[in-house]
Amino acid sequence: MKKILQEFKQFAMRGNVVDMAVGIIIGGAFGKIVSSIVADLIMPAVGLLVGGVNFTDLKITLKHAVMEGDKVISPAVSINYGNFIQVTLDFIIIAFAVFLLVKGVNALSKKKEEAPKAPVAPPADIQLLTEIRDLLKNNK
């Protein structure tokens, strides 16, 4: 049992796992920010532009609620396509942000790859043989 715990500790403390965990936490927080931007800023403005529509209220009612006084006997059944539009916009914004991030990382890695490497000097024995060859060519 102790060996399994040690192996798990080694696995959990590797750089990739910790980096991934940090990425997931930051990604979750970023998703909440984007959702708030879409729900609280973008969708009200879009709704105002298209005639004061609240997108979260857009739905197709398949079955109306059955009420008895103030008591709901059977809830309404509806297709909430307005909420779907809002969530789709969330996804598009997050996907675009991730695309820009990946594009930036790829550009940085290309710059690192394209940096010219200094030519490696040949070993001393190869240099000596090259000098001997050149001297023999010049003496002919």
From Swiss-Prot:
Q: Where in the cell is it found?
A: Cell inner membrane
Q: Where is the signal peptide?
A: none
Transmembrane domains' residue ranges? 11-31, 82-102
Q: Name one Pfam family in it.
A: MscL
Q: Which PROSITE patterns match?
A: MSCL
Q: Which UniProt keywords apply?
A: Cell inner membrane, Cell membrane, Ion channel, Ion transport, Membrane, Transmembrane, Transmembrane helix, Transport
Gene Ontology cellular component annotations, sorted alphabetically: plasma membrane
Protein's membrane topology: Multi-pass membrane protein
Q: Which domain of life is it from?
A: Bacteria
- A molecular-function term among this protein's GO annotations: mechanosensitive monoatomic ion channel activity
Q: Which family does it belong to?
A: Belongs to the MscL family.
NCBIfam families membership: mscL, PRK00567.1-4, PRK13952.1
Self-association state and partner proteins as the record states: Homopentamer.
Q: What does this protein do?
A: Channel that opens in response to stretch forces in the membrane lipid bilayer. May participate in the regulation of osmotic pressure changes within the cell.
Name this polypeptide is given:
Large-conductance mechanosensitive channel
